[in-house]
Amino acid sequence: NRGHSCVKGRFAWGYANHADRVQSPMIRDSIDEPWREVTWEEAFAHTAAKLRSIQERHGTGAIGGITSSRCTNEETFLVQKLIRSVFGNNNVDTCARVCHSPTGYGLKTTFGTSAGTQDFDSVEHTDVAIVIGANPTDGHPVFASRLKKRLRQGAKLIVIDPRRIDLVRTPHVEAAHHLALRPGTNVAVLTAMAHVIVTEGLVDEAFVRERCDWDAFEDWAAFVADARHAPEAVELLTGVPA
């Protein structure tokens, strides 16, 4: 981290010490009623009764459990034990299967490793950085601090995001380009960029031949070179001026 705080270290104190933080269990029987504080014993009994009534009404499989990717192995084990032993079914999942597993598979298939192919130090050697669909200042302040340092040294930044994130313009840092695309058109914008790279002869052929499947690359290059993928052709879709 080199002296910089991570997300939890930088922001966790805000909600941990917030005056509105709930510190005791509360129950209400309807949305129109105010919350009332109860003991932990009453809270557990109330929750158990509600879960039991759901199964009685809708069947054993009506309840499942899903854990966070930030749970420890022990916590995840306890959740699956609860679902199987107490609720009597196998409806157990984890959000990592939805978010990280597809990412890892895609990275492995494309780049040969299921993790990022660069390290934080690489940003210190970049001349142009592209930030797409991310807000490093809030989501990863350690990396954002190092990126801002490099930008202050003269590197250029391209932000591709519908939002005007902090990096678009902040003290001593300003993006050279902000492509405020319409939500959901990321692929179209990236394909249009690839179209320009391929059709204007900007491909580093030696690099691609060394590191990629050249036959597959040629198939892809022919696809993105189609006039349908030109920046002018997708401008109305993406909202990004050609």
Name each model-derived stretch.
Residues 201-234:
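Internal, active-site/partner-interface "lid" segment
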Residues 1-200, 215, 220, 241-242:
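N-terminal export/assembly segments and adjacent metallocofactor-ligating motifs
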Residues 36, 229-237, 241-242:
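Histidine-acidic residue clusters that define the catalytic metal-binding segment
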